[in-house]
Amino acid sequence: MIFHVCALPHTHSTAEYLACAYTAKVINFCRMMRSLGHQVFLYGGEKNEAPCTEHIVCVSEADRAAHVGDNHFTSASFDYNLPFWTNANAKMAAEISRRAEKQDFVCVIGGYAQKQIADALPHMITVEFGVGYGGTFSKFRVFESYAWMHVCYGAATMGKPHDADGNWWDVVIPGYLDPAQFPFSAEKDDYYMFIGRLVDRKGYRIAADVCFDLGKKLIVAGQGTPPLGAEYVGVVDPVTRGKLMSR
């Protein structure tokens, strides 16, 4: 099979940007599909570390950096009406058109922000291959979990839950990881760890409260404002993450 994978234009498909869950999804998807012998064409920024048949640059580093600005890249705007998004989407659609056959798959990871790509290629099958977000549009969707699939179903009914049928071909494929990034260590240290975006719904405050009550050390990694009393290590790279988790 042949997959045309559209990366997020405001990141690079490199280890430096793995704090973005959807960029990590793109890299792991490319690695997995190439390992199975499929062809993978990857469309994105100037830098790439994901295994692929061809890497097609559709966004200049100057444009990417200007869009992100002084923000952390995970806080970049997803306003698909901005020229940054319309230009990136148009370029990706044009490059896909030069390479694709009708039976190929177009794989998008940005939800509505990349719908313009699907609209420009109506003769092709566009798949949202990692739906863990709310702005979903495609007829063909792969959800991250059953819980999130049902959230999306319910949200789409506008308060009429009995209308939440979905499609019979909807599927859940849980997130996939590279085992090499999570080494085992028989030697352990005495601490707990939370890693993720530091927003309430991720539960980091619960981790902090539990560790406080137990009198235990808590190491916190991720974007945001850490809780008081925790050792904050910032946004960590895959090597540091692997070491912290292994201990």
Across the structure, where does each feature detected by a protein language model lie?
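Catalytic cores of nucleotide-sugar-dependent glycosyltransferases that transfer UDP/GDP/TDP-activated
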Residues: 1-247
